[in-house]
Design a protein with these regions (language model features):
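Short, charged N-terminal helix-start/capping segments
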Residues: 1-8, 116, 121-123, 189
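Midchain, well-structured core segments that form catalytic/ion-binding scaffolds
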Residues: 1-111, 136-137
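Alpha-helix N-cap and loop-to-helix initiation/capping positions
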Residues: 16, 111-114, 173-176
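Predominant activation on well-ordered alpha-helical scaffold segments within soluble catalytic domains
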Residues: 18-29, 84, 116, 120, ...
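Glycine-rich loops and low-complexity Gly/Arg-rich segments
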Residues: 23-26, 70-73, 89-94, 123-127, ...
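Active-site-adjacent substrate-binding region
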Residues: 26-33, 101, 105-157
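Mature, folded catalytic cores of secreted/periplasmic enzymes
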Residues: 31, 39, 43, 55, ...
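Zn-dependent metallopeptidase/amidohydrolase metal-coordination segment
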Residues: 128-195
Length: 199
């Protein structure tokens, strides 16, 4: 977000990029609630903002970053369109300009239903704590593979009780899940090979 910097005592001599950026961020929080079907899971999260480097100067520009997560491609397209609309128009209203660098992440990971059912059955035969988790908005590059080749993405459940989840520096992994993960891959690889051999 590009404004015009000024001394903090004379904000009228500049165009405040911080005020404009916070207005954009605030407006983006309504993107889901007023544009997307409430039955659909869509998340808009602004996770990082940087502006200025001292206490008495209003900076020329500000940067913010975040992510939009959807399960539906139409929702993804609409969220992107509305993101551009909101960002550019709020910027214009505040007298600043906005430059958007949109990075396309992986699509949603869809497990192959037939393989999922097969692996659930096989894994349940040797492990008594197998569950089908709720859909997750977490992004995963594995989605690119299962778009081309039928596959299954599984969570092993390695996070210790009470420990923070993914991407937290103090996440604690349970060592006892390592053999469970090995068993999952080895047992199911043999089960799938046997299934393929039998046709």
């Amino acid at each position: 977000v590009k404004g015009v910097g000024s001394h903090a005592a004379y904000p009228h001599e500049g165009v405040d990029s911080i005020v404009a950026t916070t207005a954009i961020i605030s407006s983006l929080q309504q993107l889901v609630s007023r544009n997307i079907d409430p039955q659909h899971a869509v998340v808009v999260s602004v996770t990082h903002m940087v502006a200025g480097n001292t206490w008495n100067v209003l900076p020329d520009d500000a940067i913010f970053e975040g992510t939009i997560r959807t399960f539906d491609t139409a929702d993804r397209a609409l969220a992107k369109k509305r993101f551009y609309d909101v960002t550019e128009n709020v910027a214009k209203a505040y007298g600043v300009t906005a430059e958007i660098d949109w990075i396309v992440g992986p699509n949603v990971t869809y497990n192959n239903p037939e393989l999922s059912a097969f692996l659930f059955e096989k894994t349940s035969a040797w492990h008594d704590d197998v569950v089908i988790p709720e859909a997750s908005n977490a992004g995963e590059d594995f989605a690119t593979y299962v778009e081309q080749i039928p596959g299954v993405f599984a969570f092993i459940g390695s996070n210790a009780p009470g420990s923070p989840g993914l991407h937290f520096s103090d996440m604690v992994l349970k060592d006892e899940t390592i053999p469970v993960a090995v068993d999952y891959y080895v047992n199911n690889a043999f089960a799938l090979l046997e299934k393929l051999r039998k046709g």
